[in-house]
Amino acid sequence: MFRGATAVNLDSKGRVAIPTRYRAEILEKNQGQMVCTVDIRQSCLLLYPLDEWEKIEQKLLALSNFDPTQRRLQRVMLGHATECEMDAQGRILLSGPLRQHAKLEKGLMLVGQLNKFEIWSDVEWHTQIAEDIEIGSSTDFAADALNDFSL
């Protein structure tokens, strides 16, 4: 399970180091194999351990090729999906198109979302968090979507 937001750096070759606290789990369950793709709603990347990605692939496979919206989702998610293998130093290589989509430069944020990571430009991340907090403070959290949620 991946939790928390960690500042990491992208090196000159496009590699990012997975924080040490997550490496053993990724190696044990997935032999260091991960899949990275784009987020369809925001300018970040989604990084899945291989076993979690395989669940997503099955869901995408079940979508209709004849429904334009479902087909677009398949095209974007699968079309950008790139296998990433952790090297001996715990780094993964992010392809150029993925880095471009998320506007990645040197400073990144690796954000745990339990079954996956989001990878953000540090600038985009801080902007997004500020917006989320602002919207959250002006939103009625008693909305139906959160009725059964408690902290």
UniProtKB/Swiss-Prot annotation:
GO terms for molecular function: DNA-binding transcription factor activity; transcription cis-regulatory region binding. Belongs to the MraZ family. InterPro entries: MraZ, MraZ_C, MraZ_dom, MraZ_N, MraZ_sf, SpoVT-AbrB_dom, SpoVT-AbrB_sf. It is found in: Cytoplasm, Nucleoid. HAMAP family: MraZ. One of its GO terms (biological process) is negative regulation of DNA-templated transcription initiation. Disulfide bonds: none annotated. Its main location: cytoplasm. Residues 5-52, 81-124 form the SpoVT-AbrB domain. This is Transcriptional regulator MraZ.
